[in-house]
Amino acid sequence: MSDLPLLVVAITVSLYWTGVGAMIVRVRRHLRKDAGLVPEQARERMMWLVWVPLVASWIALPWLATSHAEPWLAVPPWARDGLPFAVRVAAALVGIACLLATARCWKRMGDDWRMDVSSRSTALITDGPFRRIRHPIYAFSILLMICTAVVLPTPPMIAIAVLHVTLMHVKARNEEAHLASVHGAEYAQYAARTGRFVPRLTTRGP
């Protein structure tokens, strides 16, 4: 019998990165730009050297675990029944919600979406999913990764999750510095009333 939460998260992660690919194609078709597939910044190009194999592993590991993988790649026996299994089911459902929420963010960004920090002028989006969180796409990516690690609690998957969360923080900080330099006071005001990955409970003073 197949492990349902594992299958669900494998499909969800694959659809997530298929959506990223679709956004790249969309921006390229509309603007004749590469949407940041090859970053402009040297710093981000260095990050890509880690991120590309990380993403490939994120996609592959759940599928490998569904196909009678080696024990160190498979769902541990303790996670297949009872409360751990119920937690894994819940994580798989949250993962689906992350995918749907990310799709809403993609729709709102439209042709302003990019994978990298770009010299191309883009709008500062502060409404919709971005009204209370500066990086909702990154936040949902982090949560989806955590859900994947909960569904597949193996050493390789957990290590990839820790690395991904770390890179998301580095990427967000780099992007914020760029946006502050481009949008100035407008971005400073936006940052003061929003959180990076979760809504801010209080607004920072000037």
Residue spans for each PLM region:
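Membrane-anchoring alpha-helices and their flanking helix-loop junctions
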Residues: 1-126, 144-206
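Histidine-centered phosphotransfer motif of kinases
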Residues: 131-139
